[in-house]
């Protein structure tokens, strides 16, 4: 149960970075 939260946090961080990079490249 303790391993789920860091995994979700890192996954959300990767998604946010990918969305940010895609947004900047589209601009």
UniProtKB/Swiss-Prot annotation:
Main localisation: mitochondrion
Single GO cellular component term: mitochondrial inner membrane
The enzyme's E.C. designation: 7.1.1.2
GO molecular function per UniProt: NADH dehydrogenase (ubiquinone) activity
Keyword Translocase: yes
Membrane topology label: Multi-pass membrane protein
UniProt KW keywords: Electron transport, Membrane, Mitochondrion, Mitochondrion inner membrane, NAD, Respiratory chain, Translocase, Transmembrane, Transmembrane helix, Transport, Ubiquinone
TM region(s), chain numbering: 3-23
Reaction catalysed by this enzyme: a ubiquinone + NADH + 5 H(+)(in) = a ubiquinol + NAD(+) + 4 H(+)(out)
Keyword NAD: yes
Compartments, as annotated in UniProt: Mitochondrion inner membrane
Function: Core subunit of the mitochondrial membrane respiratory chain NADH dehydrogenase (Complex I) that is believed to belong to the minimal assembly required for catalysis. Complex I functions in the transfer of electrons from NADH to the respiratory chain. The immediate electron acceptor for the enzyme is believed to be ubiquinone.
Record family assignment: Belongs to the complex I subunit 1 family.
Name of the protein this chain belongs to: NADH-ubiquinone oxidoreductase chain 1
Native species: Simulium vittatum
